[in-house]
Regions:
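Thiol/disulfide oxidoreductase modules built on the thioredoxin-like
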Residues: 97-102, 109-153
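N-terminal "domain-start" segment that seeds a small globular fold
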Residues: 4-38
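Short active-site neighborhood of thiol/selenol oxidoreductases, capturing the structured segment around
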Residues: 36-59, 65
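Soluble periplasmic/extracytoplasmic beta-strand elements of cell-envelope proteins
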Residues: 49, 81-83, 138-140
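Active-site acidic short loop of glycosyltransferases
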Residues: 41-44, 74, 101-103, 120-121
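Extracytoplasmic
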Residues: 21-23, 41-43, 74-77, 87
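Structural microenvironment flanking redox-active thiols in thiol-disulfide oxidoreductases
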Residues: 60-99, 110-117
Length: 158
């Protein structure tokens, strides 16, 4: 058997940090403009997915991301899909409806605040944050969130 069969580094686009990164103020809004601070979710495994409706790879990965939220082996996972391009709530809602996204809500970044905080180079980008609030990995570009290698790896942080 291949020892590396479950090696997440085989999945392109995943960057695993040796030095965990801590961010002080990671704040974004829900669709009612209520502010959300990720500190409220310490103790949870967080996936912050940055996206826009015009982004084709974002559109491709969103359904598998939606399924990831209800994966029974990842009960501690919270997904925040954060729109970073100041699109109208109406446009974002219809994007979610068209793709049948049902397991998480859209969130909104104040004009590119988090894009700067996380030094995003493009979208989609997903930031993975452990139970202590530290970024331990990021996914630059899209992946298939149904990938069992990815899910098994993520379970180790759950």
């Amino acid at each position: 058997t291949n020892v590396f069969a479950n090696d997440v580094s085989e999945i392109k686009n995943i960057v695993i940090h040796k030095d965990l990164k801590v961010y002080d103020n990671v704040i974004f809004s829900d669709k009612n403009d209520k502010k959300i601070n990720i500190k409220e979710f310490n103790g949870n495994l967080l996936l912050l997915n940055f996206w826009a409706t015009w982004c084709e790879p974002c559109k491709e990965e969103m359904p598998s991301l939606d399924r990831l939220q209800v994966n029974q082996n990842l009960s501690n996972l919270k997904i925040f899909a954060i729109n970073i391009s100041q699109e109208s709530k109406k446009k974002v809602d219809s994007f979610f409806e068209d793709l049948n996204i049902e397991n998480f809500d859209p969130y909104f970044d104040a004009p590119t605040t988090l894009a700067k905080t996380f030094s995003l180079r493009g979208i989609p980008t997903s930031i993975l944050i452990d139970k202590d609030g530290k970024e331990f990995a990021r996914i630059i570009g899209s992946i298939n969130f149904d990938d069992n290698i990815f899910i098994d790896w993520l379970k180790t942080y759950n």
